[in-house]
Amino acid sequence: MAKQNTVLIKLVSSADTGFFYVKKKNPRKTTEKLEFKKYDPVARKHVVFKEAKMK
């Protein structure tokens, strides 16, 4: 079997609410850290989510 290309990463809220999204990423194609502006239901507004490693 071939090695899996995608890895799971965690997108952590910059509002420090503890809320996160889980997303797949191909580390060979996108080497830089991901950053998205998404909705944080705890803060109840759109904030920047930054990539962190899954434990």
UniProtKB/Swiss-Prot annotation:
Database matches in Pfam families: Ribosomal_L33
Any one GO molecular-function label of the UniProt entry: structural constituent of ribosome
Transmembrane residue ranges: none
Swiss-Prot/TrEMBL GO biological process terms: translation
Keywords carried by this UniProt record: Ribonucleoprotein, Ribosomal protein
SUPFAM superfamilies recorded: Zn-binding ribosomal proteins (SSF57829)
GO cellular component, one term: large ribosomal subunit
Entry-linked PANTHER family: 54S RIBOSOMAL PROTEIN L39, MITOCHONDRIAL (PTHR15238), LARGE RIBOSOMAL SUBUNIT PROTEIN BL33M (PTHR15238:SF1)
Record-stated family: Belongs to the bacterial ribosomal protein bL33 family.
Name of the protein in question: Large ribosomal subunit protein bL33
